[in-house]
From Swiss-Prot:
Residues covered by region (Disordered): 117-164
Catalytic activity, as annotated: S-ubiquitinyl-[E1 ubiquitin-activating enzyme]-L-cysteine + [E2 ubiquitin-conjugating enzyme]-L-cysteine = [E1 ubiquitin-activating enzyme]-L-cysteine + S-ubiquitinyl-[E2 ubiquitin-conjugating enzyme]-L-cysteine
Active site residues of this protein: C315 (glycyl thioester intermediate)
A Pfam family assignment: UQ_con
Keywords tagged on the record: ATP-binding, Cytoplasm, Nucleotide-binding, Nucleus, Transferase, Ubl conjugation pathway
Biased composition (Basic and acidic residues): 120-131
Organism of this sequence: Caenorhabditis elegans
Xref: InterPro entries: UBQ-conjugat_E2_core, UBQ-conjugating_enzyme/RWD
The protein's name: Ubiquitin-conjugating enzyme E2 25
Tissues where the protein occurs: In the embryo, expressed in precursor neuron and muscle cells and in other cells such as hypodermal cells. After hatching of L1 larvae and in all subsequent stages, strongest expression in pharyngeal muscle and anal muscle cells. In L4 larvae and adolescent hermaphrodites, also expressed in the vulval muscles. Expression also detected in all four nerve cords and in neurons with weaker levels in all body wall muscles.
Deletion phenotype: In males and hermaphrodites, late-onset paralysis of muscular functions required for locomotion and defecation. In addition, hermaphrodites show a progressive egg-laying defect, resulting in intrauterine hatching and premature death. Vulva protrusion is often observed with occasional rupture resulting in the projection of internal organs.
CDD domains: UBCc_UBE2Q
Length: 387
């Protein structure tokens, strides 16, 4: 478990160097799965950045994304960090990120930054993950800085420690590499993740890559989170891929809504008369996800009111680029849609002329018109008393 131990140590280094009261860069929360941090620019505005640690870290870098995609340098810097094959260590990546942002805003580098700088190229351990690899990046204690002499016994102890570290890495290679990231994920979820991973790998080999690395990894994380979710386990909603080879198109089935709503009564009638116990939605993601929102539309049944447009698109600022944030999870989006339907007094149409499903083309057209209208008039924000 040398890699995991090293990651925990590096996280502790970051939290110590950049606490929540640091004037330039702050670690807001940190775990072996995800780090959330804030960069404070010259205008004292906070820029939130998140790093998702992949299961095969440090052989693969973290997945980086930010809520502040309006600043071009952030997107470019995060893309470089996510796609790099060098300096995948979290300390080195944070060093690169802070350096890029300080240069962009013409700010002085934090005095703590050199302590997490990557080593000289010749010193980088090719194994990426041993305890030897990043020792030069750890902060130097004041007591150690004053010691200029190292005796032979100390050198022998260091050699023994290095040897132990190498042995630990061999042991770790025999373990399930997904164990840390897949805790709490159901067998069904693990099977889906395994199948999707194999398909993605084959698509790369065939040169038929879908989407982007960032979008694919974020969607895989969303699948894990969904299969851990109590809402999912309690049957509030279910989800599946429209096609098993396409990670970018999902079916979402909403099974439960507020029991005090007319929509709840309509869903009971739908199940009794038509043997359908859910509202079916299509979620389509593009290669810019999570920076761009998914395109969401109702597929069936036909719904009147509830902010559902004629083509099946949904009138929600959350689903537009202006209202979306890369920090939103897919589950939070699903639950917000359910609340919006109830708030808008959505009703299922049992009229025979509405038995056919909506179409993607009509939904896209109506949503485009919606965006143009709200771009001019803005969005209505209800008072807090209305929820």
């Amino acid at each position: 478990m040398a890699c995991l131990r090293k990651l925990k140590e590096d996280i502790q280094v970051l939290e110590k160097l950049f606490p929540k009261n640091h004037n330039r860069f702050q670690i807001l929360s940190a775990s072996v799965d995800e780090l959330s941090m804030k960069f404070i620019n010259a205008e004292n505005k906070g820029i939130i950045v998140t790093a998702n640690i992949q299961e095969n870290y440090p052989r693969q870098p973290p997945i980086w994304f930010s809520e502040s995609d309006d600043v071009p340098v952030i997107g470019m810097s995060l893309q470089r960090l996510t796609e790099t094959e060098e300096s995948t260590n979290i300390l080195h990546q944070v060093h690169r990120l802070v350096s890029d942002l300080c240069s962009f805003y013409n700010l002085q580098m934090p005095c703590e930054l050199p302590q997490i700088a990557p080593p000289v190229r010749d010193d980088i351990d090719e194994g990426r993950g041993s305890d030897i690899s990043d020792t030069t990046s750890e902060p130097i204690d004041d007591d150690m800085a004053g010691d200029g002499e190292v005796d032979d016994d100390d050198e022998e102890e260091e050699d023994d420690e290095d040897a132990d570290g190498d042995i630990e890495i061999v042991e770790m290679a025999e373990e399930d590499p997904t164990s840390q990231h897949d805790v709490g994920v159901s067998k069904e979820g693990l099977d889906m993740l395994d199948k999707v991973s194999k398909i993605n790998r084959q698509q790369h080999l065939d040169g038929k890559v879908q989407g982007s690395i960032t979008a694919t990894d974020r969607l895989m994380k969303e699948i894990r989170d969904i299969h851990r979710s109590e809402h999912f386990k309690n049957g509030i909603y279910t989800f599946e891929l429209e096609k098993e080879e396409n990670l970018y198109q999902w079916w979402i089935k909403l099974h439960k809504v507020d029991e005090d709503s007319p929509l709840f009564e309509d869903m009971k009638k739908l199940k009794k008369d038509h043997n359908q116990d859910h509202l079916l939605f299509s979620f389509t993601f593009n290669e810019k996800f999570p920076c761009d929102p998914p395109f969401v539309r109702v597929v069936a049944p036909h719904i009147n009111q509830g902010f559902v447009l004629g083509g099946g698109a949904i009138c929600m600022e959350l689903l537009t680029k202006q209202g979306w944030s890369s920090a939103y999870s897919i589950e939070s989006c699903i639950l917000q849609i359910a609340a919006t339907l109830v708030k808008g007094r959505a009703r299922i149409s049992f009229d025979a002329k509405h038995t056919s499903t909506y179409s993607m083309a009509r939904a896209q057209q109506s949503f485009k018109s919606l965006q143009q209208i709200h771009a001019k008039s803005g969005w209505y924000t209800p008072p807090k008393t209305e929820g």
